[in-house]
Amino acid sequence: STLFPYTTLFRSRDKLYRYDRMAINVIADNVKGGLSFCDVAVCDDLETFNANYMHLTETISRTCQDILDDEAVIVGTSAVTGTELDSITNQYSGIFNNPFLAWGRYRKGWLKTTLPISFQFHHAQMDGKHAARFLEELQRIVNTI
């Protein structure tokens, strides 16, 4: 089963959209010192997703050209690794209406390492139960790494 089995319908303003595929938007530093963006297709196989992620992020970092998928529903992400953070709030502007996942640095403790994340979603797209199911599945996958 896919990590996002329940997110095929998304509401935007007064319209409801159905998408056949989903992608994760990733932001990467590029060789010019700026930021570039790519959309990595969601798939059931974590190794395939990772290979696609590595290829796309290396490409956009080197070429400074965004690689975006206009036909997929996009889940935004952001790795703010230059700092520690607990949350990012109010990301709802024109381009951030879909679910949004962000994180900062790992926090290394004496007995464990943690990575706090911030997950936002709009209730027109999913309910709290769906968000909790997503986070539980994400934690399950992280526990296998």
Predicted regions and their residues:
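Short, small-residue-biased leader/transition segments that mark boundaries at the very start
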Residues: T2-L9
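Short, conserved, surface-exposed binding loops centered on an aromatic residue
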Residues: L16-R18, D66-D69, S93
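A generic structural signal for well-ordered coil/turn residues at beta-strand boundaries
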Residues: P5, M22, E71-V73, I95-N97, ...
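Helical lid/core segments from catalytic subdomains that handle acyl or acyl-like groups
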Residues: A28-L85
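A common structural junction motif
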Residues: S61, L138-I145
